[in-house]
Amino acid sequence: MIVEPKFRGFICTTSHPIGCKKNVENQIEYVKENGKIEGAKRVLVLGASTGYGLASAIVASEACDAEVLGVSFEREAKGKRTASAGWYNIESLKKFVEGEGKKFISVNGDAFSNEVKSEVIDLIKENMGKVDLVIYSLAAPKRKDPVSGEVYSSCLKTVGAPFTSKTLDFHTGEIQDITINPATEEEIEGTRKVMGGEDWMLWIEALKEANVLENGVKTIAYSYIGPEVTYPIYREGTIGRAKNDLEKTAGEITKVLKSLNGEGYISVNKALVTQASSAIPIVSLYISILYKVMKEKGTHEGCIEQIYRMFKELYEGNLNLDSENRIRIDDLEMAEDVQKAIEEIWPQITSENVFELSDAEDFKKEFFKLFGFGLEGVDYSEDVDITTV
């Protein structure tokens, strides 16, 4: 069938298999051009199908020549409904890696569940022995507590007081004022349960108990801080509370891994167009301005550039750590001259000048690319088989 983008709000409900494959190939190409990294050899990536998790799986496999086990929860094609972009991404990467004669194991299931943890541990024992790097990059709207069975939901709200600011509807290019209401205590706790560090710790404890962690193992979870303009909705909101919990967990994990000389790290990454960030009010406008400023300065990076740099710093022993022991690969975003330029543009921006003062057009293009649309070298008028890549 011929696949075209279809939308429900900020969610694209279709994905293009050949476009997703091309997107993965472009990232692989970047890594190959930049050379090998002497690093991890057996890697578990939790949340391996999109964004930073996908980039981590690609860098591990292609730069480090590591065996990779990737866990994701994606939708296969059914009837006339395409698979999710993540499903095509993982299939594309798996085919490519196996074509090179390397190992890539994928598990499609709920990483929050005990069943998937057990399945992954068995697969590590059978195929890899032990892993020396665990990447934690899960993003989900809900999580079922594996002990109590209670289902928790995450939400995107402020804490304490409502907050009004500008946001961008990137479909229309309109700048609108938006008010975000404060969360209840229940919503704050729900977001922490889904997006905090609890499940990361459960994974590390289960892997350690099963004796599938290598001596000197490292584990990294991804976070974001950003500038003050986004604080009320992000860092000081429900998501920020969850990220604080995630960051606190890194130190606790280092204690758990002490007997293995292991370490838990948080990597604070750059703001990028992802399925998650495009739905966050205010952040979409901030990213559009950020992209324009960083491109003009020649410092712009996407997921793959960020993660390649992080792996290189991690394994070459020159990590950029802050006072709280967090890896800072958001350093180019948070550079004083970049943030000063954004602060100057922010109050001036309107629906009339948004395409001139920001990179709103590119935000839209990048968003479409997440689902395999708008990539060079893909004929979108062709009939495609939506069940495979």
From Swiss-Prot:
According to its UniProt record, which reaction does this protein catalyse? a 2,3-saturated acyl-CoA + NAD(+) = a (2E)-enoyl-CoA + NADH + H(+)
Question: What EC number(s) does this enzyme carry?
Answer: 1.3.1.44
Q: Where is this site: Plays an important role in discriminating NADH against NADPH?
A: E74
Residues the record marks as active site: Y234 (proton donor)
Q: Which GO terms describe its biological process?
A: fatty acid biosynthetic process
An MF annotation (GO) of this entry: trans-2-enoyl-CoA reductase (NADH) activity
Q: Which UniProt keywords apply?
A: Fatty acid biosynthesis, Fatty acid metabolism, Lipid biosynthesis, Lipid metabolism, NAD, Oxidoreductase
Annotated NCBIfam families: EnoyACPredFabV, PRK13656.1
Describe the function of this protein: Involved in the fatty acid synthesis (FAS II). Catalyzes the reduction of a carbon-carbon double bond in an enoyl moiety that is covalently linked to a coenzyme A (CoA).
UniProt-recorded name of the protein: Trans-2-enoyl-CoA reductase [NADH]
What species is this protein from? Clostridium perfringens (strain SM101 / Type A)
UniProt gene name: fabV
